[in-house]
Amino acid sequence: RSGEPNWPSVSAHQTAPAWSKSVQWRKANILQPETYKSDLDGANAVVHSMGILLEADYKGVLTGKESPIAGLRRAFSATKAGGNTNPMDRKPGQAIEPGEKDGQITYELMNRDSAIALAREANDSGVKAFCYISAAAGAPILPGRYINTKREAESTVSSAFPRMRNVFIRPGFLYDSSRAFTMPMAAVTYGGFLANSLTGGNLTWLMGAGGSKPLKADLVAEAVVESLSDDTVKGPVEVKEIEELANRAWRRNML
């Protein structure tokens, strides 16, 4: 990211919250490991929380910048390029560039390749635990490549870097009051969750993440910290376990 955020644009805070003063903000490019490699030295854990829900061409359809037919054809294409080089084959000092001719940021590039690149650097730096914010499932309105690239990242990280304790957090839809547009979407998703629950989860195949319980972003963050503090937590962490980890952290903080 670009360092300390502009708080009014990303949260309900008009000024920097108190906790942010304890954070050492760094400017780096996830696709250029040399820009953050030194920050990994001595780190106990690394968290990858970047990703895209909609690709640029899909947004273009919604904003009218691209024709619906052309945009949707590209958005739902079976395959797209990730980086211009496999992150596992990247040479020291080499940056990863978008593999699409128009420089598009694709699911393959952001959801998969950037995570693998970061995990590789973390492993080489001796980091003990790596956490990847994945997803519970896809959704009918999203291209299948959204969830496929998430699962590909999980698979590659777990198989290529077994020395690290790899944790894959799989939440459903994330919401927060600071992002007003997420609130009505969370309400709709919660309705889907209730409907799916009443059928014993039999609608999961149809609804995907739309049938999972939406979670507040802060709750997921607490679960991430708790998972990295517990050496027994590894592999995929589903919605129910995310809630359990967050509740455990809450109870401990109340003592």
Predicted features by range, described:
Residues S9-A117, E121, L228:
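NAD(P)H-binding glycine-rich loop region in Rossmannoid oxidoreductase-like domains
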Residues S125, G138-M254:
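Oxidoreductase cofactor-interface core, primarily capturing Rossmann-like NAD(P)-dependent enzymes
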Residues R1-P5:
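Short, polar loop motifs at secondary-structure junctions
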Residues E97-G103, A129-L142:
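Short, flexible active-site loops
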Residues A115-N123, V127-A135:
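Conserved Class I SAM-dependent methyltransferase catalytic core
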Residues S49, F130-A136, I169-P171:
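SDR active-site strand-loop-helix element
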